[in-house]
């Protein structure tokens, strides 16, 4: 078998660099978050950040249905006392004890009430506290990223090597 040419090596190197850069971006974005999820995607601007935008909606129906111009879909209406009008918050925000949460327009306080759509009253004592994660270098994540990049490079190398070997078996008739 032939040694891989400069084109195959260049392709493997570029693929490895792209994987390394992506892993570095995800590691930086996920720092302080519990695992890789919506928090990391918000920091990378892949997922719309709705927490600040929910507060701008002042009507319950607009809040729970979402505003198409702002791409909102995870807002709920929170009302703590009957005399207060309530406000729109993101579902992920901490809810005060004793507040009613409305997630359908039929259940909004100003709208007509349907007996099957009762608001959910939150009676939890304290919100869950995320695990403490000290900022800094995480050796296990670094080793995992290196193993991931090297394995992807090896797969790309062997796939290109296999395709190159298949092409070299064909001979012209003339």
UniProtKB/Swiss-Prot annotation:
Disulfide bond positions: none
Signal peptide extent: 1-29
Pfam families: MGC-24 (PF05283)
Subcellular location: Membrane
Extracellular side: 30-141
UniProt keyword annotations, A-Z: Glycoprotein, Membrane, Signal, Transmembrane, Transmembrane helix
Main location: membrane
Record keyword Membrane present: yes
Membrane-related topology note: Single-pass type I membrane protein
Glycan-bearing residues: 71, 103
Transmembrane segments: 142-162
Cytoplasmic face residues: 163-174
InterPro entries noted in UniProt: CD164_MGC24
GO cellular component: cytoplasmic vesicle; membrane
Superkingdom of source: Eukaryota
Entry similarity comment: Belongs to the CD164 family.
Protein name per its UniProtKB record: CD164 sialomucin-like 2 protein
């Amino acid at each position: 078998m032939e040694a891989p040419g400069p084109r195959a090596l260049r392709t493997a190197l570029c693929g490895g660099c792209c994987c390394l850069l992506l892993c570095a971006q995800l590691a930086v974005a996920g720092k302080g978050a519990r695992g890789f999820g919506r928090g990391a995607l918000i920091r990378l601007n892949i997922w719309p950040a709705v927490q600040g935008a929910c507060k701008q909606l002042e009507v319950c129906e607009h809040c729970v249905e979402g505003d198409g111009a702002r791409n909102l879909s995870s807002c709920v209406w929170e009302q703590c006392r009957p005399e207060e009008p309530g406000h729109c918050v993101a579902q992920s925000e901490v809810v005060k004890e004793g507040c009613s949460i409305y997630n359908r327009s039929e259940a909004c306080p100003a709208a007509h009430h349907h007996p099957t759509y009762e608001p959910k009253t939150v009676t939890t004592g304290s919100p869950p506290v995320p695990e403490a994660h000290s900022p800094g270098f995480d050796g296990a994540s670094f080793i995992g990223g290196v193993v991931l990049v090297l394995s992807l490079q090896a797969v790309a190398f062997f796939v290109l090597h296999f395709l190159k070997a298949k092409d070299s078996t064909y001979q012209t008739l003339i």
